[in-house]
Amino acid sequence: MCDIYHWGLIAFIVGILFLCVFMLSCGYFLGGCSSSRSKNVPFESGIKSIGNARIQFSVKFYLIAMFFVIFDVEGIYVYAWAISVRDVGWIGFSEIFIFIFILLVSLIYLIRIGMFDWIEQSSRHVHCVDFFDIDTSRYLKKSNKR
C-alpha cells in the first residue's frame, strides 16, 4: 500500500497539522479576551484619533494591487527563463513567447474593459460632446443637472 518513501510525507503533513492546532489552541487558552468601550477605539502612536478612522477606499486600489502582484509574479517566471535560456533551447523560447503573448492579451483585455480607468463609466461619457449634435444647449442643460 504505502511505500516507505511516503511515510516521510505523511509524517510531515501530520506534524504541520499538529503544530497549527497546537499554536491556535495556545493562543486561545493563554490569550486574554476582554472587551470594553475603550478597546474598540482606534489608537495609534499614543495619539487619539480625530474623526472616523475607518476610511473607505475605492475598489480600484485593490484591483491595481492585484494586477501588480499577478504581473510581478509572472515577471519572476520570465526572469527564471532568462537565466536558463541556453539550456531550454527553442522549445523554451516558444513556451516563453506563448506565455508573454498570453500576458499581453490579458493586459490588452484589462485595458479594453476599462479596469485601469479611474473615471467611472457614467461620468466619463457625460463630458464628451458629440460634434454632430446640432443642439448642444440641450446637452449642457442635462449635464449641469448632475
UniProtKB/Swiss-Prot annotation:
Keyword terms: Cell inner membrane, Cell membrane, Membrane, NAD, Quinone, Translocase, Transmembrane, Transmembrane helix, Transport, Ubiquinone
Record's bilayer topology term: Multi-pass membrane protein
Transmembrane segments: 4-24, 63-83, 91-111
Source organism: Blochmanniella pennsylvanica (strain BPEN)
GO cellular component: NADH dehydrogenase complex; plasma membrane
GO molecular function list: NADH dehydrogenase (ubiquinone) activity; NADH:ubiquinone reductase (non-electrogenic) activity; quinone binding
Location of this chain's protein in the cell: Cell inner membrane
PANTHER family: NADH-QUINONE OXIDOREDUCTASE SUBUNIT A, NADH-UBIQUINONE OXIDOREDUCTASE CHAIN 3
Disulfide bonds: none
Name of this protein: NADH-quinone oxidoreductase subunit A
Catalysis: reaction(s): a quinone + NADH + 5 H(+)(in) = a quinol + NAD(+) + 4 H(+)(out)
Quaternary structure and partners: NDH-1 is composed of 13 different subunits. Subunits NuoA, H, J, K, L, M, N constitute the membrane sector of the complex.
Similarity remark: Belongs to the complex I subunit 3 family.
